[in-house]
Amino acid sequence: MNKSESLYAAAQQLIPGGVNSPVRAFNGVGGTPLFIERADGAYLYDVDEQAYIDYVGSWGPMVLGHNHPSIRDAVIAAAERGLSFGAPTEMEVQMARLVTSLVPSMDMVRMVNSGTEATMSAIRLARGYTGRDKIIKFEGCYHGHADCLLVKAGSGALTLGQPNSPGVPADFARHTLTCVYNDLSSVRTTFEQYPDEIAAIIVEPVAGNMNCVPPLPDFLPGLRALCDEFGALFIIDEVMTGFRVALAGAQSHYGVVPDLTCLGKIIGGGMPVGAFGGKREVMQALAPTGPVYQAGTLSGNPIAMAAGFACLTEVAKPGVHEKLTALTNQLADGLLAAAKAENIPLVVNQAGGMFGLFFTDAESVTCYQDVMKCDVERFKRFFHMMLEEGIYLAPSAFEAGFMSLAHTPQDIERTIEAAQICFSRL
């Protein structure tokens, strides 16, 4: 028994499933999860002293790579001044100014502690602002583990085979209307069925929790138009795509302007940070200026704000996203070529610094039903083969991969070489 196996056995006696977030348990691929000792740049190092090229990046936040000196130094400096104050700080103002300058659709922003808090709060705000109860979400899109959003969800809910989570009361779920991602007709039909009851649409602009499924060209603009037609708010969940697909998020890349935006992951630079923001008129409905209540003891934590500010300052530098996209292109093209050489049917989806691998004979993967037809068993074998070659992919066929600026062309060539070996054995 190696050290990861020993730690996992101990953890299972103390923590449900041995992990503090389900997808980490390797249930989607089988086997024992790696216990990580440290990370640096594009590499993870486990407790058994094995090194891996990392394409999980802490599930998205590590766009600069692990242990980036600017973020590390900012965290240390902030910690020396105190860990938490429960009172406003100058860094909160600086962080809010930076975020709203980078994302033009956000006139105002409220900091929270996670992406789940951001989406949950945005939904409450939309309901309070519109006076309506129902929301529209999409099959396979995951917006955190709030009760109203765990309906036909993606991410770990798909991995567990529980798209509708037990513990969500039917009274909550009935207010969540589920449509088909990339299918505007299903959305119009739903609006026509409940024309005066829908408070908002919430959508991942790139569905990153049923692997990586970008929007069709007319999808996001069509959602914006339907919200305008029926008086609903348009909420874009950029927890995963924000500052990764483009500096101003996927909304700028695809040319749409939401009423509210949810952020997480990169905004914290590896610390637990989320945020939601949007039009001034809507945001001023939040307490203490308005009647919609939202609060958090650790929201705007000074260490988290320092980490986020340092991360976004680096991400905003010229050429960052061009480089990130070029590296992802190199990986996607190389994997496709390697699979083709071994007659392995593979679709690779990509959006900026995100990518997804689908073992399928289909020409494209554009919705939840396409994803569910892919060969999950083949992915499981591929995952473990790649792990043996020192490549760490997301341990689920339903999770996106993430590139970082710390990856080098040589790292990517090494990854493609490993994939060639694995494809030849699949």
Swiss-Prot record:
UniProt enzyme class: isomerase
GO MF annotation terms: glutamate-1-semialdehyde 2,1-aminomutase activity; pyridoxal phosphate binding; transaminase activity
Keyword Isomerase in annotation: yes
Cofactor(s) the record lists: pyridoxal 5'-phosphate
Keywords (A to Z) from UniProt: Cytoplasm, Isomerase, Porphyrin biosynthesis, Pyridoxal phosphate
Positions carrying N6-(pyridoxal phosphate)lysine: 265
Subcellular location as annotated: Cytoplasm
SUPFAM superfamilies linked to this entry: PLP-dependent transferases
Listed GO CC annotations: cytoplasm
Pfam families, sorted: Aminotran_3
Source organism, top-level taxon: Bacteria
Self-association state and partner proteins as the record states: Homodimer.
HAMAP family, per database record: HemL_aminotrans_3 (MF_00375)
Name this polypeptide is given: Glutamate-1-semialdehyde 2,1-aminomutase
Species in which this protein is naturally found: Pectobacterium atrosepticum (strain SCRI 1043 / ATCC BAA-672) (Erwinia carotovora subsp. atroseptica)
